[in-house]
Design a protein with these regions (language model features):
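Juxtamembrane transmembrane-helix termini
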Residues: 3, 7, 26, 49, ...
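Transmembrane alpha-helices of multi-pass inner-membrane enzymes
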Residues: 35-36, 135, 165-219
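Long extracytoplasmic/lumenal interhelical loops at the membrane interface
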Residues: 57-121, 142-157, 162
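Hydrophobic transmembrane alpha-helices and their immediate junctions
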Residues: 17, 121-166, 188-192, 197
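Membrane-interface catalytic loops of GT-C/OST-like multi-pass glycosylation enzymes that act
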Residues: 4-8, 108-112, 176-186
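Hydrophobic alpha-helical segments of polytopic membrane proteins
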Residues: 1-45
Length: 225
């Protein structure tokens, strides 16, 4: 991640680190290990990496960031003028469309999954996209709840937990990257469906067994009249 020089990737990595703090039971150990890994890694990176990352705090004077702001403006204007479905895949960054709103400016990718979808598929497309993300978080929470504390479903619980962290990284890092259709995000969403079905089936079977045991105990020890 650090070797990619991507500010969006760094944001995603920071989101994963923060999520880990709230998930782990051994926070002090986790923080100590995080520091042991992060400090040498940052010292190992060249000056060009630090200069690029420092541009996050100097966004107002960074030409690359200004290009993103221009792209966000174009995405909004395109969604407004081509309501409700936008102009299609990669439309807003086409020179002819981009310069129609910002004459003379260099066309620029949105570098944000949210503005990318807004410009390409309009307000309705963005709404559907956000609902999909929200549904993925809700589903992962349901899977974790159904599988928590059940030894034979531990793998389902762990997978749902990691998918949830993956979604957090995608949503945070994606705010600075044009990766709206990233295949790992699609795979995360797709995997949650069978995981939920498996967790529901296992939970229902466990409940059925408990009910059968309770009924048998009542039959063996009838309540006196």
């Amino acid at each position: 991640v650090s070797g990619s020089y991507s500010r969006g990737a760094l944001l995603g990595l920071a989101a994963i680190a923060m999520a880990g703090i709230f998930r782990t039971r051994h926070r002090f150990v986790y923080l100590a290990l995080l520091a042991l890994l992060a400090i040498p890694a940052l010292n190992f990176m060249p000056d060009s990496f630090h200069e690029r990352m420092q541009s996050i705090s100097n966004a107002g004077t960074d030409a690359s960031f200004q290009g993103r702001v221009d792209a966000w403006q174009v995405a909004f204007y395109v969604a407004r003028d081509h309501f409700p479905l936008g102009v299609g895949f990669y439309g807003p960054q086409l020179k002819e469309i981009f310069n129609a709103y910002l004459p003379g400016a260099t066309s620029h990718a949105a570098h944000s999954i949210y503005f990318q979808v807004l410009g390409e598929h309009g307000f309705i497309g963005l709404a559907i996209y956000l609902v999909l993300i929200a549904a993925a978080f809700i589903t992962s929470a349901q899977v974790r709840k159904l599988s928590r504390g059940i030894p034979e479903l531990e793998w389902i619980f762990q997978m749902a937990s990691m998918i949830q962290i993956s979604l957090i990284a995608f949503c945070v890092g994606g705010a600075a990257l044009s990766l709206a259709y990233y295949d790992v995000f699609i795979l995360d969403v797709a995997l949650l469906i069978p995981l939920l079905n498996l967790a529901r089936a296992a939970a229902a079977a466990k409940k059925k067994v408990k009910r059968a045991i309770a009924d048998r105990q009542i039959g063996e020890n009838p309540i006196p009249a």
